[in-house]
């Protein structure tokens, strides 16, 4: 009898436990439990004991106690982020012997009650720890961090750390990734990272560092120093081993010169944008070096670097960003050693000239951004830049270039010349005036922008034998497009823009461009289009701010199967006679922009929304017009008859008077 009673009690206990679990609002899937954003004040005590993943983020937890957290000994992932935790009971995580990932981000660990003896305590199997956003300061951090022999990733971002010492990181022998971004770090003591022999990724961005003069982390592969106040960067003078650094970010600092990178031969990514760099450069002649404010990485005065020596070891560099600096000149000797470079950004500098004349110069370069400088001259050698695919030159002052400047670039696919003063030559039979640039015969070029170049005449054959797919000739007021100017593009052109040119007549046989998908003719003075009588590929047609009153079906019929979007605002559209357009609106085959606000006019000059026009409105208008014509015709015929009758009467009266006198 007694065993039966015990069994009954056990079943009742399990039933009550199951009933209590059913009342918990957390979501449970397999061994994963999510209690995110439920307003909980404490860790639930009725969850399955075999839970491996527990998400308690976004609640109102203020303290973490060993019980009931210790009940869930199978936990591997524990997320306690975005709470109000200010108290950690000693040994709170001691029972979680399988815990691998722990997040305490965005809590209140900096409050005094979080500093109970032992801090976090030992975390023997934790590989990922997030303590970001807790207002932690340097002294507190050393007391909070415990032994973590398996830790690979540690985030201390968005805290209040001002200094790193040789005691900050200890008992973390396998740490690989350390995130310290968005603190207030001003000093890094010598040996601060000596206890991290496997550290490969270090993020120190958005701090208050002013100088790096003794960088000695040979094992590091990725270093982010962006958004500080660094004036100089220099490696240790006698490193114990070869540096492994491949990724270095120094953007948004106060660098005055190109850093000395002679000891970093493996570097493949270098970002120096948004600094004060000039080439060639260095400290003023009377300078004795730039001194750091304290010991450590910033301990020694910096020697004046040589830009030539700095560039020489960068033979493996793939990406170099020097945008937003004060560079006025790029010496040839600086570029000649960058034999692996694929991406070079020199935009937003003070360049007036750029030269790459040497044979084999920058052989691997695929993208060159020289936009928004003050370039007046551009000299590219016949065998230079052999791999260049994208050349960005917008926002410069280029004019009177050598005619074959771009024809020599054998791999060029995309060219942006917006905002210059470049005039295209014509085809072989019409070369054009002195100073024009040839765009014909560039067999690799697919995309060309000549926006805002003050082009007056686009000559016949300007792009002959150049298989362009995108051509933008917008914002050239007064542009005259000669007959045959776009000849040769009929089988390749997909995007054509002629916006804002003041065109009254379009001397382009558009229906012949069988691949054309996007056509922009906005902000001109056009009133007629060529007739598309056969099916084409056009999907988007922009006719805004022109002089169109009618879009007859006889001209637009060929677009019915392909056209998807039509822009018509700003045209004096007629409400009647636009049967094709009305059909598109009512059938929904074409997305006409802002149909509720698209205005049209009746013959009486009455303006209404085009979408509100009904067929009978035009029929009434037609009947009114017919009646008016009939009345006018009757009046005219009556006037003619009366005039004729009066004339006959006058003639007969004259004859009668003559006979009477006789």
Curated annotation (Swiss-Prot):
Keywords, comma-separated and alphabetical: Cell membrane, Disulfide bond, Glycoprotein, Growth factor binding, Leucine-rich repeat, Membrane, Repeat, Signal, Transmembrane, Transmembrane helix
Example GO BP: secondary palate development
Signal peptide start and end residues: 1-17
Membrane-spanning intervals of the chain: 626-646
Residue ranges constituting the LRRNT domain according to the UniProt record: 21-48
Pfam families assigned: LRR_8, LRRNT
Coiled-coil ranges (or none): none
LRR repeats: from-to residues: 50-73, 74-95, 98-119, 125-145, 150-171, 174-195, 198-219, 220-240, 244-265, 266-286, 316-339, 340-361, 364-385, 387-408, 411-432, 444-465, 467-488, 492-513, 515-536, 537-558
SMART domains per UniProt: LRR_BAC, LRR_RI, LRR_TYP, LRRNT
Cited function: Key regulator of transforming growth factor beta (TGFB1, TGFB2 and TGFB3) that controls TGF-beta activation by maintaining it in a latent state during storage in extracellular space. Associates specifically via disulfide bonds with the Latency-associated peptide (LAP), which is the regulatory chain of TGF-beta, and regulates integrin-dependent activation of TGF-beta. Able to outcompete LTBP1 for binding to LAP regulatory chain of TGF-beta. Controls activation of TGF-beta-1 (TGFB1) on the surface of activated regulatory T-cells (Tregs).
Protein name (Swiss-Prot/TrEMBL): Transforming growth factor beta activator LRRC32
